[in-house]
Structure formats: C-alpha cells, structure tokens
C-alpha cells in the first residue's frame, strides 16, 4: 500500500487535492516521466512497479517530507491493527504470554516502517525481523528442525542465486 499511497499523493499534489511533496520529483525521476503521463506505464508495470516506489517514501520521510511521514504513519497503524487483532486472539487464554510476530520483507529492513510499527503495538508483543525469506520456514518444517549454520548458509546462497536469476 505504501507505493500506491505514494502514487496517490503525487497525483493529488499534481491536481491540487493534496499537499506538495518531495515524492513528486522522486517518483517522476524513477518513472522517467511526469506521474500523470506515466499512468499507462504504471498499469503495465503492475504491483511490482508500484511496490518499488516504497523506498522513495522512506527516503522522503527521512528528509522530513510531511506527506511521506503521513503515509508511513497510516500504513504502520494499519499493520498495528492487524498485530493487535492477532495478539487478542493468540493471548486470549494467557494474557501474560508473549505474542511473537515475525516481520518479513523489505519494508522492515533498515528502518523502513519498523520504528513506526514498533511504537504502535501492545505491550507483550515481540516484533522479530526475519533475516531469511519466508520459504526458509517451509524448509525448516520439511527438514524437521532448524538446520545447521552450514546448511542455512548454503540455502541462503542458493536462494539468492535463484532470486537473481528470476529477477535478471
């Protein structure tokens, strides 16, 4: 949603429905065209293109852009609502238990949305940033245990090579 919100903010700034934002220049530079003119390209690029705009929001927010800060706050609040709902279900029978939530994906790496999310989750929730891809959990389940560091290293190397090949 962050990339989509960035596009919306840029288009709203363009037509006067929203505040000016440094996202406009950043998004248009990435798209290689004015956002208004790039709409057909955005549709062709789909979710992957839209998601690729999220880092621009984090960079603009770090630079003090109020619109970007608002995008991060709204998305963090949405995620925190999901965490609160899960927490309420998982700790229903044991309110003193710790609810561990594993966060995976680029949004949670190197700052991203993590700080805004962490300040919004209830006490007793432990946020864990995954340093492995989600498929690693399936790998561990299939092997029946947490693999040794050597096996983990080979898995990660093979995964990185496959990801590079698929994205190349």
Task: Outline where the language-model segments fall.
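Loop-centered beta-sheet repeat module
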Residues: 1-5
């Amino acid at each position: 949603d962050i990339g989509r919100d960035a596009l919306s903010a840029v288009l709203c700034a363009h037509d006067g429905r929203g505040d000016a934002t440094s996202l406009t220049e950043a998004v248009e530079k990435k798209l290689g065209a004015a956002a208004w003119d790039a709409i057909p390209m955005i549709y062709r690029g789909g979710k992957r293109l839209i998601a690729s705009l999220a880092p621009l929001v984090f960079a603009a927010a770090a630079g003090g852009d109020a619109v970007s800060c608002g995008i991060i706050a709204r998305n963090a609040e949405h995620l925190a609502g999901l965490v609160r709902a899960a927490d309420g279900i998982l700790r229903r029978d044991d309110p003193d238990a710790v609810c561990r939530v594993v966060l995976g994906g680029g949004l949670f790496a190197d700052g991203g949305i993590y700080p805004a999310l962490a300040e919004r989750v209830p006490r007793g929730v432990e946020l864990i940033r995954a340093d492995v891809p989600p498929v690693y959990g399936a790998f561990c389940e299939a092997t029946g245990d947490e693999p040794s560091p050597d096996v983990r290293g080979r898995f990660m190397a093979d995964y990185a090579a496959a990801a590079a090949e698929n994205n190349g």
